[in-house]
Amino acid sequence: VKNSLFTSLPSSQTNIKFENKPASHNLFNILYYLYYYNGGGVATGDINNDGLPDIYFTANNKGGNKLYLNKGKFQFEDITQQAGVAGTSDWCSGVTMADVNADGLMDIYVSTVSNKYGLTGHNELYINKGNNRFAEESVKYGLNTACLSTQSVFFDYDHDGDLDCFILNQSHHPHANIKDTSNRRFVDALSGDRFFRNDISTIRKFTD
């Protein structure tokens, strides 16, 4: 379109060839899972501090996530495997980039749907080790929640200089809540939103 604000660039030019193909198995499909077609997520951030925003995509299938390193001039390189960030959970949803451990390097936090519908896994935290390498350390940081996560955000809610984490979870629509609405006052272990405070003693750890 003439004088358009945006221009669509083909994958042949950018080398971004990510595709999200939702997994369907064991009756896990749109008929049983209301959010089946919500899609994955995307986050941009400068993982190597070269001044260029890199891109991370999440997929609704195991090992389908992709990390693209920005080489400049709208050209990207798929470094997923060498970076170690393909993902190990069955169903990934949103993704957030933030400097979780305050070391000056951008980390990656992946939200996942797990512990229901036959889906395995947990939210994944990839800590940036430098040189475009990451290590999955969600257990170490206490952010390995296994629930119905849609998206997460990091922010300093208590103004103590470190990032805390809020996780938005989707509902699994339990029948008990429909019959007795008073049940909605209680936090559901799978679908209740989660808020983690960043606590530092000898190590950095998040507390729900």
Q: Which sequence ranges carry the predicted segments?
A:
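Beta-propeller-forming repeat regions
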Residues: 1-208
